[in-house]
């Protein structure tokens, strides 16, 4: 849902990340084994903050929690204060007008723009929206992620113009380069979250 503005603590995290990566590079093959280990990957690459909120609302909306984690990783880097140049807010980078529409569809009394910075509220609305997209695009994650990134209207237009059906999976055919890369990254990272966390989640 757009680029984001990083907070200072995110910048500090990147400094630590680069220091660790440099150290591993310097010690060669052994370092690469350390880098690819689950402990390092989950600590520096595939972190999962706000897991309780994600599990709760992904379950309520019957969507894949690992996909939600991947969306957040790619949208905001788990930065609750992230704001894109276009105005998308919070963990799942929800645009204010989209958030207002979601709130109305959910039957909420009112939409709270400032609350989008709160993890629980943002994830609640974002998971509902992902559930809506999953239903609309018949559980096709490629189409679902195209719609999340480029909009439902563009997705429908591309389906019509290019003869895509609900079995579409040719990511390379996506017209927007940014959306194409976004879909690749989200689906790749979803598989990594599944690999590292599937045995750590109860009742999954």
Located regions from the model:
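N-terminal Lys/Arg-rich, disordered targeting/topogenic segments
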Residues: 1-13
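Catalytic glycan-binding domains that act on GlcNAc-containing polysaccharides
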Residues: 30-204
């Amino acid at each position: 849902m757009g680029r984001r503005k990083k907070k200072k603590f995110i910048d500090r995290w990147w400094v630590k990340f680069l220091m660790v990566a440099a150290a591993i590079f310097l010690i060669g093959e052994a370092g690469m084994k350390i880098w690819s280990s689950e402990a390092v990957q989950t600590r520096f690459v595939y972190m999962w903050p706000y897991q309780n909120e994600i599990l709760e609302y992904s379950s309520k909306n019957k969507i894949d929690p690992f996909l939600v984690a991947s969306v957040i990783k790619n949208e905001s880097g788990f930065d609750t204060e992230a704001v894109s140049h276009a105005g998308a807010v919070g963990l799942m980078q929800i645009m204010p007008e989209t958030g207002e529409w979601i709130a109305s569809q959910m039957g909420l009394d009112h939409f709270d723009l400032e609350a989008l910075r709160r993890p629980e509220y943002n994830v609640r609305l974002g998971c509902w929206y992902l559930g809506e997209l999953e239903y609309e695009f018949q559980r096709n994650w490629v189409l679902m992620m195209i719609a999340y990134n480029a909009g439902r209207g563009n997705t429908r237009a591309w389906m019509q113009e290019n003869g895509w059906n609900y079995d579409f999976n040719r990511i390379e055919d996506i017209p927007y380069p940014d959306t194409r890369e976004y879909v690749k990254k989200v689906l790749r990272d979803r598989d990594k979250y599944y690999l590292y966390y599937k045995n750590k989640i109860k009742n999954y």
